[in-house]
Amino acid sequence: MAVRPIRLFGDPVLRTPAEPVTDFDKELRVLIKDLIETMQDAPGVGLAAPQIGVSLRVFVYDVDGVVGHLVNPSLDLSEEQQDGDEGCLSLPGLSYPLKRAKRAVAKGFNEFGEPVILEGSDLLARCVQHETDHLDGVLFIDRLDPEQRKLAMRAIREAEWAGQTVRVKTSPHPTRGKAL
């Protein structure tokens, strides 16, 4: 297993809808282990396959000490909303307030192709929504209100990583595990 470089804002893979997984094989299991290792090394609470350059519908999470994964997810979201700050390992150092559904039910598969239902609220619900967005080629900054998005784009242009498309970790992530 390996820690893989995390793709940064500007890399086209982050804007491309990921392909469904069709082969539940050893390669998928290695990918999931690499995703978990990379997420924990970053550190973050979630990571989607496109964030390491693999355009497949897979994400991993580590919320409240529970580590897991979901393949080919689909979401059912509550109408009730939650407020919270959100960041992203592909946009290091940036965090903005963003409304998300308070509860989420994600249906998908485990690494062996067996059906899985993942239900959660608060941070887990936020994580599942954020990571599923990655699988659809959507970044959290796309969901910001126009004024916040303008601020985010300015911060991206001024970031030390601006213009790079791959991040190799050199120091702990400034959000201390709060990035998704």
Curated annotation (Swiss-Prot):
Gene3D superfamilies: Peptide deformylase
Keywords, ordered alphabetically: Hydrolase, Iron, Metal-binding, Protein biosynthesis
InterPro entries: Peptide_deformylase, Peptide_deformylase_sf
Active site (record annotation): E131
GO BP term, pick one: co-translational protein modification
NCBIfam families in the cross-refs: pept_deformyl, PRK00150.1-3
Protein name as catalogued: Peptide deformylase
Protein's gene: def
